[in-house]
A protein has these predicted regions:
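Proteins enriched for Cys/Gly/acidic motifs involved in redox and nucleic-acid/cofactor modification
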Residues: 1-195
Length: 195
């Protein structure tokens, strides 16, 4: 796949969606719980997703029971992370039964695999949204459409890899930062879904 830069207009559109989500719940504090498995790129992506969530009015929490939004960001290269993700998704079902307004999403390279997307779509009906790494920058739009339509938004990787700069980031550490030095690769390793 090719990498393309996200335009300033596309970034501005995501900021518009951030404001629209913020306006949906102006009087209530909302919390986001992020669960990350796998590589350092996933850590960097999770920081970006949490930054966007904060811009939409969410506060990062370490307690999934407190969350209004749960995001799981697993790695597809490591099978253990995939299996752990599906197991944890099953545990989150019980939280959603207690809190039907809870929104649960899975993102990352695991979702980029068609068989995993189909598996989640069919076996995990309480998962509200899925999107692959190419659509990380569209998280505000995907969340807004999930919240306002009441329908599941299930995307794999749409189009080309997107390089999006200028979106908010939440750093989990005060003394280190995950920095992406490349997006994708062209080695076409048989075990990897990235290219």
């Amino acid at each position: 796949k090719n990498s393309t830069a996200v335009t300033e207009i596309q970034i501005a559109e995501q900021y518009r969606y951030m404001e629209l989500v913020r306006r949906l719940f102006p009087e209530r504090e909302r919390f986001v719980f992020m669960q990350t498995f796998g590589c350092q790129q996933n850590e960097a992506d999770s920081e970006r997703l949490c930054g966007m969530a904060e811009s939409m009015g969410y506060t990062v929490t370490g307690d999934p029971e407190q969350a209004d939004l749960i995001i799981v960001n697993p790695c597809a290269v490591r099978e253990h992370a995939e299996l752990k993700t599906l197991s944890i998704a099953g545990q989150y079902k019980h939280i959603k039964e207690k809190n039907p307004d809870l929104i649960i999403g899975i993102c990352g390279c695991m979702v980029s695999q068609d068989h995993r997307t189909l598996d989640i779509k069919n076996k995990y009906p309480y998962i509200d949204f899925l999107f692959g790494t190419f659509d990380n920058y569209r998280f505000p739009e995907i969340l807004y459409k999930t919240l306002t339509s009441g329908k599941r938004i299930l995307l794999g990787n749409e189009g080309d890899a997107a390089i999006a700069e200028g979106l908010p980031v939440h750093r989990f550490s005060s003394f280190k930062a995950w920095v992406s030095i490349m997006y994708g690769c062209n080695n076409f390793c048989t075990y990897c879904v990235v290219p």
